[in-house]
Structures are given as structure tokens and as C-alpha cells.
């Protein structure tokens, strides 16, 4: 039975960082996006107004809290407050990218746990449910006192990766110990070997790869990470894999931030044949690497379409993965 959504009861809104993504989602759902105004005053203050009634409606509001992280976050908090004051029946905040996710614990004295603070702010603003995507650490889900769905996207990437590299001689690589769980999930799904990069981080945004744990010689390597910030981690990993005589190196990361000189570093990595393919999703709007054949953006609209349909029809979100993983295991 084909699922549908009643646009009179369920409305999707997008804020500034998720507009194109939501346009694609609404096209797939064959519904109209909700009408709203989001503006910024000369002093930087954010102004939000919803131009249609939200009373007694189930609302899904999309916003990636990506650079400028603080402005994006304030847009979302103010929008949620406006929806609550407009008597929305429920407010589901869908954050394709969750800023401050890396500040999820104290590593030194007198540090904040900012990820927990953001969770409290979203809850206090009036969100009834939060949807996160490939969150940096699973413990973030426990920071919320409201229901949280943590989505995974690897099954969407895998179709394209296998098409390019095939399964033969393919090894899944975690660029550090923190990503082992994520990489092992993919390796187990495809029944592939796993390798781990032994990495140390002497300072913020600086990574040094020391050693490879696992066999990568004459193998096609798939480096898997949740995000690319400055690119230091994956480029250092790619250099080490090349040194260990890997055949091809493909990088797959859900969130492409590409801060500082990341674009230049990756262009050099492409030219030097360090990295053969780089995949990110459109969880964050992508404006770099235009017309670069080694770079590809994977669309998450189909995933969010399925998620919204599950909410609208009171179905299990977990079933989405079970269905996709079963298909991958049978056909890949």
C-alpha cells in the first residue's frame, strides 16, 4: 500500500539552511511547503513569522545548524517558539546536521557540555521530537528529555560506492578509533574486512595518522566518517593508505563542512591521486567543488520523505533501515 500524507494536518517548513532539501522532499511527497518569513534585522536579530495557520497541525521543521552555526540555531529556536505559540499540535525539529555535536563531553576542567545545552534549548523552546542524522556520538540522544530519532545514511551511499568500486578487494576503513563502530556496521552489512587508522590529535583541527591496523595493500579502501571539517583526518588517512599501497581510496562522509582551506586541500589530494572519489550528502548545502568529477553529493530527500511518511502514518522508522539493509544484502 502506498503511503500518503494529508497536507491539511501535516505541514513541512524549511529554514535558511535546508531550503533546497525541503523542496525536494515536498516534491517527492507531492505536497506544498508551508509558507513562512525568515529575515534578519540590521543588528543581526532574527525575525520569524508563519504565514499560515499551524493550529492543531503536526509540524515538521527542517534546519541544519551549520555555519553560521549560532545564527542557524537561533532561527530554529525562534521558529519552534513561534509554532508553539501558534498552537501547533506537535513540533518535530529535523536537524540534518546538528551543530555543537562534537562538544559532547568534558575533556578538561571548566569546559561546558554544549551539546547537552543545545538539547535543553530545543526542548525548552517547545519541540516535541527531534530527528538527528549520523550524529557524531550516540550519547547525544541521551541529552534530550523528549523522543529522539537518530537516522543513519550509509545505506544510501553504499549503492553508489559499490557501483564505482565493486565489492571485490574492498576494505572499509575507520579514520580513527572513534569511528570504528560506524565503519564496522558498514563492514558487517557488506561482509567486508575492516581496517583502522591509528591517529592522534595534538590540537584542534590537527590530525596525525600513525599506523594502519588491517590489510590494505592492493585493496580498494572506503574511508567512512560522520563529517569532514577541515579535511585533515581523511587526507592524512588517505596518505597513509597510499603509503601502504592501497589501490583506490574513496571517502564517504555524511556532513561536508569543508572549513578553512579544506577545498584547496582536497583539490590537491585529487590531483595527487590520493583520493579517487569523495562523497558527502546534502545535509549541509554544498557550494564547493563545482564541476569536479571526483566529488559527488548524495541526496537525502528520499530518506526524509520516508521518515515523514512514517510519522504521518504512525509507523516504525526502524523499518526503513531493515528494508534497505535487507535489499543491500540480497543485491550487492
Swiss-Prot record:
Catalysed reaction per UniProt? D-ribose 5-phosphate + ATP = 5-phospho-alpha-D-ribose 1-diphosphate + AMP + H(+)
Cofactor binding description: Binds 2 Mg(2+) ions per subunit.
Compartments, record wording: Cytoplasm
Q: So which cofactors does this thing need?
A: Mg(2+)
Cite the binding residues for Mg(2+) 1: 136
Question: Effect of knocking it out?
Answer: Probably essential, it was not disrupted in a global transposon mutagenesis study.
Which top-level enzyme class is recorded in the Swiss-Prot or TrEMBL entry? transferase
Q: What is a biological process (GO) this protein takes part in? A: ribonucleoside monophosphate biosynthetic process
Q: Which UniProt keywords apply?
A: ATP-binding, Cytoplasm, Kinase, Magnesium, Metal-binding, Nucleotide biosynthesis, Nucleotide-binding, Transferase
Q: List the catalytic residues.
A: 199
Q: Where does D-ribose 5-phosphate bind?
A: 201, 225, 229-233
Enzyme Commission no: 2.7.6.1
Q: Where are the transmembrane segments?
A: none
Q: Has UniProt tagged this entry with the keyword Magnesium?
A: yes
Q: Name the CDD domains for this protein.
A: PRTases_typeI
What HAMAP family does this protein map onto?
A: RibP_PPkinase_B
Homology family: Belongs to the ribose-phosphate pyrophosphokinase family. Class I subfamily.
Q: What is this protein called?
A: Ribose-phosphate pyrophosphokinase
User: Which species does this protein come from?
Assistant: Mycoplasma genitalium (strain ATCC 33530 / DSM 19775 / NCTC 10195 / G37) (Mycoplasmoides genitalium)
For this protein's source organism, the top of the classification is: Bacteria, Bacillati, Mycoplasmatota, Mycoplasmoidales, Mycoplasmoidaceae
